[in-house]
């Protein structure tokens, strides 16, 4: 029979899941961070990743709507402000669009979602469905991938600035902000999970939630790798750098 874990052991188990399954282990990220992708492949990554960025505040709004405690809502709503900002030129979504602009992508194309890979769209929609349908505890636990974000962000920024002459530190401003936002958010979520996962069943659910979220991030990179690295099978309506040259800003 499985025993109830203490808070510290539960945290250790959650961190072990991330160490094994977080998307920093995916081959596509190794290629991105070590300068092995060309400009078109980096564009494809940024364009598809925008779908995930766009849906982060939708995910957080869905979680917020299920919180009955005003104090909890006040804390969680900061996540929405972080991404939506206080104006169209502020926040994480605006900063990601600044990155896609800097990479030479047409903003209308990026925002429209017309050129997404199906795998990207399905993975993101699966995540939204998860936080809407599962328990509040599971939804919060699914955000714990942020525990592992600072490490991958550091690798990404350093690697991209070193290897890609078409990327600037200004273009990567999104990641600078996440270096402070992600630890703040994950510290709160981890404390919440450790406090509220107070049965064997709940502890199994929060571990499964983190496992699921890791699979969402991994699936997005699988789609990118299959389409733009090997074997190079691109959905006919998805972004193709050479074919879509007329849809990319000069």
UniProtKB/Swiss-Prot annotation:
Q: What class of enzyme is it?
A: oxidoreductase
Which pathway does UniProt place it in?
Cofactor biosynthesis; pyrroloquinoline quinone biosynthesis
Q: Does the keyword Heme apply?
A: no
Instruction: Enumerate the Pfam families for this protein.
Output: TENA_THI-4
Biological process according to GO: pyrroloquinoline quinone biosynthetic process; sulfur compound metabolic process
> Its family?
Belongs to the PqqC family.
The name this protein carries in UniProt is: Pyrroloquinoline-quinone synthase
């Amino acid at each position: 029979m499985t025993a109830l874990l203490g808070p510290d052991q539960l945290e250790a188990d959650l961190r072990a899941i991330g160490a094994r399954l977080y998307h920093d282990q995916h081959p596509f990220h190794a290629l991105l961070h070590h300068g092995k992708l060309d400009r078109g492949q980096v564009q494809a990554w940024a364009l598809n990743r925008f779908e995930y960025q766009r849906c982060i505040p939708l995910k957080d709004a869905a979680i917020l709507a299920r919180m009955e405690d005003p104090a909890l809502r006040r804390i969680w709503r900061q996540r929405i402000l972080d991404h939506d900002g206080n104006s169209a030129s502020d926040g994480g979504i605006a900063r990601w669009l600044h990155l896609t602009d800097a990479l030479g992508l047409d903003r209308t194309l990026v925002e429209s979602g017309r050129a997404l890979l199906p795998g990207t769209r399905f993975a993101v929609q699966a995540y939204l469905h998860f936080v809407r349908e599962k328990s509040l505890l599971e939804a919060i636990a699914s955000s714990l991938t942020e525990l592992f974000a600072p490490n991958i962000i550091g690798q990404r920024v350093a690697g991209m600035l070193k290897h890609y002459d078409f990327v600037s530190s200004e273009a990567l401003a999104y990641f600078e902000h996440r270096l402070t936002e992600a630890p703040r958010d994950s510290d709160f979520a981890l404390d919440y999970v450790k406090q509220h996962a107070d049965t064997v069943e709940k502890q199994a659910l929060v571990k499964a939630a983190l496992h699921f979220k890791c699979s969402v991030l991994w699936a997005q990179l699988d789609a990118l790798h299959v389409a733009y690295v090997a074997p190079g099978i691109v959905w006919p309506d998805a972004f193709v750098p050479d074919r879509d040259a007329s849809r990319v800003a000069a």
